[in-house]
């Protein structure tokens, strides 16, 4: 009896091959169609990106780099990766790109391996101030392998405390200074960071995972003229598949990063994901992407303004980007309770600590909201004003009825459903 796959192996659809997984995917599609996604780190990719990521390139091993592989049969995956590299360089105005990191965290780890030795000092924004785990937080590898110094924000306005940055840099002489974060809503003065880095002889790295798409769209400052190296995810505002990327204009750093990614921390790259990255980068080069990026920021400001009118505080007083931190203390609510109630109303977000938060990280005094995904659906300023009113209604209901907010949630959920019907996805 032959052990070779039968014709059914190549023809049987997922719905028949594995009904349980198919059901989970179908239910997730319905969730995305029927809920307003307000998680700042999430977006909705095009059908073209989905097709590329679900392609036969998932079958191919391709250790190495285009033209220098350790496997045969790479001529076509080389095309996809070369397109991703050249398009990334065109988008961000740089001479080097590595598109192989499988996540933003691995992109950061690749930079650390290329430029640092265990025990070196790094400096990044503290998690409590809006930074990211991989910028030196104690539970993360970056906080275990390196001496991590953390800067924060000013108490009066929740913006980067450059006096503290300068003092810490001069005191600790870090080898690497990191700018960027996961919950910082304002533009960052990259030139000032670079000046501080040069003064103490440090490399300057920008993690633009959250705002890369805004840079691509021309509505947020480009860090490449200032940073030695830039890392990013390829999803979030860039609207590609989940993955990472490293950019630079320094050829020597590029060579070190290539070695750090492969063979340093990764083996075979995910070629189906890289194909999806190439498609997304091609989309980001089109004129309509600039309109999208501008709309993301316009929508964020409209949402923030509406929430302020509804009696909520916005950390730092507003936003220059796609995200905002909402301080719930004026309503005497926690982020944990608000996240749950908003999800019951059909609006997905995440609880998030705010600067100088008195609550535990598992509870928090705030929520983080973002506009990229709903903007991709087609929401404009008026729709986001409506979303802000719905959030206000749900939170007011929760403040009045903390044990049972089902009535306010149901009213909001009906209006959320109507908005989602007006702006469908994947029909």
UniProtKB/Swiss-Prot annotation:
Keywords: Amino-acid biosynthesis, Cytoplasm, One-carbon metabolism, Pyridoxal phosphate, Transferase. (6S)-5,6,7,8-tetrahydrofolate binds at residues 127, 131-133. It is an enzyme of class 2 (transferase). The record marks 235 as: Plays an important role in substrate specificity. One of its GO terms (biological process) is tetrahydrofolate interconversion. It is found in: Cytoplasm. GO terms for cellular component: cytosol. The modification N6-(pyridoxal phosphate)lysine is found at residue 236. Its EC number is 2.1.2.1. It catalyses: (6R)-5,10-methylene-5,6,7,8-tetrahydrofolate + glycine + H2O = (6S)-5,6,7,8-tetrahydrofolate + L-serine. One of its GO terms (molecular function) is glycine hydroxymethyltransferase activity. Pathway: One-carbon metabolism; tetrahydrofolate interconversion; Amino-acid biosynthesis; glycine biosynthesis; glycine from L-serine: step 1/1. Its cofactor is pyridoxal 5'-phosphate. Catalyzes the reversible interconversion of serine and glycine with tetrahydrofolate (THF) serving as the one-carbon carrier. This reaction serves as the major source of one-carbon groups required for the biosynthesis of purines, thymidylate, methionine, and other important biomolecules. Also exhibits THF-independent aldolase activity toward beta-hydroxyamino acids, producing glycine and aldehydes, via a retro-aldol mechanism. Homodimer. HAMAP family: SHMT. Belongs to the SHMT family. This is Serine hydroxymethyltransferase.
């Amino acid at each position: 009896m032959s052990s070779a796959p039968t014709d059914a192996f190549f023809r049987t659809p997922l719905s028949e091959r594995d009904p349980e997984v198919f059901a989970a995917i179908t239910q997730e599609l319905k969730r995305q169609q029927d809920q307003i996604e307000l998680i700042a780190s999430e977006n909705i990719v095009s059908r073209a990106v989905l097709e590329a990521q679900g392609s036969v390139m998932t079958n191919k091993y391709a250790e190495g780099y285009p033209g220098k592989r350790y496997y045969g049969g790479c001529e076509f995956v080389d095309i996809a990766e070369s397109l991703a590299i050249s398009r990334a360089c065109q988008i961000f105005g740089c001479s080097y790109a590595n598109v192989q990191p499988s996540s933003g965290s691995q992109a950061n780890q690749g930079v650390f391996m290329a430029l640092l030795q265990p025990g070196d000092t790094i400096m990044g924004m503290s998690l409590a101030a809006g930074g990211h785990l991989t910028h030196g937080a104690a539970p993360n590898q970056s906080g275990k392998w390196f001496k991590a110094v953390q800067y924060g924000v000013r108490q009066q306005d929740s913006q980067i405390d450059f006096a503290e940055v300068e003092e810490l840099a001069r005191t600790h002489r870090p080898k690497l200074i990191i700018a960027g974060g996961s919950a910082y809503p304002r533009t960052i003065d990259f030139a000032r960071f670079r000046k501080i880095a040069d003064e103490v002889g440090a490399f300057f790295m920008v993690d633009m995972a959250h705002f890369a798409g805004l840079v691509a769209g021309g509505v947020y400052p480009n860090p490449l003229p200032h940073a030695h190296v830039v890392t990013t995810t390829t999803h979030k505002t860039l609207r590609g598949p989940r993955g990472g990327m490293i950019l630079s204009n320094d050829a020597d750093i590029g060579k070190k990063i290539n070695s750090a990614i492969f063979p340093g921390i990764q083996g075979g790259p995910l070629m189906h994901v890289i194909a999806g990255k190439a498609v997304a980068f091609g989309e980001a080069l089109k004129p309509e992407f600039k309109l999208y990026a501008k709309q993301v920021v316009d929508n964020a400001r409209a949402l923030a303004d509406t929430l302020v009118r509804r009696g909520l505080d916005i950390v730092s007083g507003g936003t220059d980007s796609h995200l905002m931190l909402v301080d719930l203390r004026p309503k005497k609510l926690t982020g944990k309770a608000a996240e749950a109630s908003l999800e019951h109303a059909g609006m997905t977000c995440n609880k998030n600590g705010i600067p100088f938060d008195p609550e535990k990280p598992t509870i928090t005094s705030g929520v983080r909201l973002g506009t990229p995904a709903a903007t991709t659906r087609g929401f404009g300023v008026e729709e986001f004003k409506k979303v802000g009113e719905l959030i206000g209604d749900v939170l007011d209901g929760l403040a009045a009825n903390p044990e049972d907010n089902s009535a306010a949630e149901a009213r909001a959920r009906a209006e959320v459903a109507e908005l989602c019907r007006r702006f469908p996805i994947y029909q």
